[in-house]
C-alpha cells in the first residue's frame, strides 16, 4: 500500500514538473500568442454571442448593403420599427463557403441548440462561369485571424469541415499577400501539435468567458398586418417614370438603357456546364450538410432575377433553381421560393433593380422570417 501511494505521489509530482517545464519554455510564445490575437478575437465576439443567444442572424450578400435606406430592409425594419432583435451578416460576394466557415468557427452546443439562421440565396451566385464560388478576398474579410483561431483550436465542428476550409486556403494561397502562420500552414500539420493546440484552446476559452455574453433572446408574436405593409411598400417605392419594369430610374438609365442601345437586351442567364463543375453549388451542398446538426432548422430564401430583363435561357436557370430547392427540402429545412419562372408570376416592385429586393420584396421576406421564427 505504501509503495503504491509513493508511486502515485511520484507520478503526480512528475506530471507537475512536466507542466512546469512546458510552461517555462513556452510562456513567451503563449504571451505573444495571446496579445497578438486578442484584438482579432474581439472581432468574433458579437456574432458568436448572437448565434448562442438565439438572435435571428440573417446571412446574405449585396442586397443587405446596396440600398441602405430602404424602410423594410431587415436591419432597419426589425430593429427600428418592430424592436425585434435581428443581425445581418454579409455584403457583396458573401456566399455559401464563407457562411459555412463562420458557422464552423463558432460550432458548439449552445449554437447548435439556439441559433436561428436565415440564408438569403441569390440566383446570381450559382450562375455565370464554373468558378463562381467565393473569392479569397471575401474569405479573408470574414475569416480573420481570430476566426481562424476559433475554427482550428476551439470550434467543435467535425474535422472534415476544418480540412475543407484548410484545403480552400491552400488552393488559393497565392492570393494572400504575406500569409501568416495560420493561413500558410495546412490544418493537417497544425492538428499534430497537440500540446500547443490544447494551450491555445484554453486561452481562447478564457477569452470567451470574459468577452462572450450570450443571454437567451425570446421572441413573442406580434400583431402585424402584412397586407397593409405591402401596400405601404408599394407607396414608398419611387415610381419608375422612365420604364414600366419597376426598375428605379437611376439604375435603368445607367445600366439598362445603354445595353438596349447596343442591342444587348434582354439579358441571357449563363449556366455552368454541369452541377459537378459549379463551385458555388458544391459549396452550397457542404453548407446544407453542416446545418443538419442545428436543432432549429434554418430558413433559406431564394431571391429572383428580373424575368423581364433576364429572359434568355430562363428555362435552364429554372431547372437549376428547382434543383437547389429540392436539396434544401431534402434536409427538411424551410424554403421560401421568390424565384419566378414566368413573367406573369412576377409582381412589379418586388425588385428595385434587376437582382436586389425593392420594398415590396423585403416585406414578403420579412413576413416569412416573422412567421417562421417569431411564434
Residues of each region from the PLM?
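A structural motif corresponding to the C-terminal end of an alpha-helix
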Residues: 284-299, 327-336
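Alpha-helical transmembrane signal-anchor/signal-peptide segments
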Residues: 25-46
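Histidine-centered active-site loop/cap adjacent to the catalytic His
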Residues: 4, 351-375
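Hydrophobic membrane-insertion alpha-helices, especially the h-region
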Residues: 7-28
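Secreted/periplasmic serine-hydrolase-like ester/acetyl group-modifying domain
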Residues: 140-285
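Short extracytoplasmic
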Residues: 42-68
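Substrate-gating cap/lid alpha-helix
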Residues: 305-337
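Membrane-embedded segments
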Residues: 64-158
